[in-house]
């Protein structure tokens, strides 16, 4: 499983994880990346902080950031590059997915061939 964090994304995630609330066991936290049906193109990216990955998650490490990938989402995320971009109007994580055949105008959702669910307009 190949998930790549750019230097900027790794820096931002490392700072975010360091500043997130500690759990009772002081467990090392990472990010869990997955996709769900949604958005105007069919699939939406999800990224959550977790210290308890799911048993079937695929685990990789980028710098000092643990990355857990949802096993069911893995085929849709193979080869993804996660970057952090800063702009005048909006800053945030940007996903470059080699499996996406198209993305919506806002860049928050994507389509993969003919297997994507029906999209709904972004709000």
UniProtKB/Swiss-Prot annotation:
Which InterPro entries does this chain map to?
FeS_biogenesis (IPR000361), FeS_cluster_insertion (IPR016092), FeS_cluster_insertion_CS (IPR017870), HesB-like_dom_sf (IPR035903)
Please name the GO terms that the record assigns under molecular function: 2 iron, 2 sulfur cluster binding; 4 iron, 4 sulfur cluster binding; iron ion binding
Which cysteine pairs are joined by S-S bonds?
Answer: none
Which keywords does UniProt give here?
Nitrogen fixation
Q: PANTHER family from the entry?
A: IRON-SULFUR CLUSTER ASSEMBLY 2 HOMOLOG, MITOCHONDRIAL
* Gene3D superfamilies reported in the protein's UniProt record: HesB-like domain
GO BP term, example: nitrogen fixation
Q: What role does this protein play? A: May be required for efficient nitrogen fixation.
Q: Which superkingdom?
A: Bacteria
What species does this protein belong to?
Nostoc sp. (strain PCC 7120 / SAG 25.82 / UTEX 2576)
Tell me which family the UniProt entry assigns to this protein.
Belongs to the HesB/IscA family.
What Pfam families does the record point to?
Fe-S_biosyn
Q: Which PROSITE patterns match?
A: HESB
Name it.
Answer: Protein HesB
